[in-house]
From Swiss-Prot:
Its main location: cytoplasm. CDD domains: Anticodon_Ia_Arg (cd07956), ArgRS_core (cd00671). Belongs to the class-I aminoacyl-tRNA synthetase family. Signal peptide: none annotated. It catalyses: tRNA(Arg) + L-arginine + ATP = L-arginyl-tRNA(Arg) + AMP + diphosphate. HAMAP family: Arg_tRNA_synth (MF_00123). It comes from Bordetella parapertussis (strain 12822 / ATCC BAA-587 / NCTC 13253). The gene is argS. Monomer. This is Arginine--tRNA ligase. Gene3D superfamilies: Arginyl tRNA synthetase N-terminal domain (3.30.1360.70), HUPs (3.40.50.620), Isoleucyl-tRNA Synthetase, Domain 1 (1.10.730.10).
Amino acid sequence: MLLEQQKQLISLIQAAVAQCLPEAQAQVQLERPKVAAHGDIATNVAMQLAKPARRNPRELAQGIVDALMAQPQARELIQDAEIAGPGFINFRLTPAARQAVVQAVASQADAYGRAPRNGEKVLVEFVSANPTGPLHVGHARQAALGDAICRLYDASGWDVTREFYYNDAGNQIDNLAISVQARGRGIAPDAPDYPTDGYKGDYIVEIARDFAARKSVQASDGQPVTATGDLDSLDDIRAFAVAYLRREQDLDLQAFGLAFDNYFLESSLYASGRVQETVDTLVAKGHTYEEGGALWLRTTELGTGDDKDRVMRKSEGGYTYFVPDVAYHKVKWERGFHHAVNIQGSDHHGTVARVRAGLQGLEAGIPKDFPAYVLHKMVKVMRGGEEVKISKRAGSYVTMRDLIDWVGRDAVRYFLIQRRADTEFVFDIDLALSKSDENPVYYIQYAHARICTMIGNSGASAAEIAQADTALLTAPSEYALLQRLAEFPQVVALAAQELAPHHVAFWLRDCASDFHAWYNAERVLVDEPALKLARLRLAATTRQVLANGLALLGVSAPDRM
């Protein structure tokens, strides 16, 4: 049922309730019955109102139905209504109401499922990998989730900024530099004098080789960095290695079809004095104390749910990692992004309360729930029934590029979105490569391609199909498909509201299933011209909505397979 139809039906039910219970304030909610045979849409409004009104719920439900069906507008939407159980009202839509989705999709096309612009803006930060190695499968899940969430925000009317925060300061960058230095000097990872916390993948050898060759590299948002070849200068090695890996990560993201609007460097927070300014403000506001030679933040007193106070400045003098995060999010707020979402691995769970506490301590009018977080669990990669743990180039993990090379970008995106972010996920390489109904990407894309081929072979023109009489679409499998297509805008709205693109992935699978069921139950290219055109119009409508849904996930909609 289209959203506009739902709004109209709710208004009509409220009018019917007012006739039965003039003093009642009806909060009418509609839901789809779990069993299709029970109807197209249902409400429990009679059960809600019966007790305070001291009425029998089934009798009240019958009164509401009688008053409702006396309204001519209701009869245009509702074919019949049935009282079920303790007082549910189940409705069956008229054929015209069911078929209205076809014209809605035709008039809106690519915009079907999208909302008008709302004048709001949001910053979504995701991937945000350390520039210390290739992007791994966890980053791939973050990239898929983040880009889909951005697309959902855009579909919901928001202006979206995609941001990548580079953790280019701290011990991990020093470890990167000394690792490249060691490999440049011919020290192998298994040698006793190789750095204890050094990186061991083959990419370290590649960086060392290019550094010695005095090559130049450039990240997408940076200046060219030319290697000096001086292995005694850790500063030179560090600058080249970071630029090299940022460029490598850029290439991974390009292969994924993902472009960021902005890159923000952690080092810039130190260089600009924002980290020190943040610390000074928290001290001045009285939210810190000294103990054991360290500076502590009173996070337990700042109302964000942290269970103990946290060290800001360690006894040896360095800041803990959440301090620049607080500074960074203050900068986000000052840039006018009063709605921000961070997509991170579940191992960042402990930082949520700390960062929010730091922001509260700044007393800058920032809400306690800023920023919002989507925390995802990690990914296990399986092939041939065994877990794949190691990439030779990365040294200790499967890379994002490995996945793309093995199964393609579309499969990587869909598979990493199809489950809730807070659940662990097993990426089955064999399944992603299979051409079967069990592979959801193949199943959905095949539905789209099958429709394109069917229309191309039909001999009917686009104009003929667009003018077809949808009143002829009355088969049960056609009603089921029409109902599914009508749900799409509400699924998009729900996915955006919950920051949960898996809702769209589920819907796409269900829609493809409904299409294949209809295709197998009813011949499309029948001899009767009017029915043939009507069914081609339903197929074309399905093709459009499948394409819209796939686009929200960053997955292609092929015309042929």
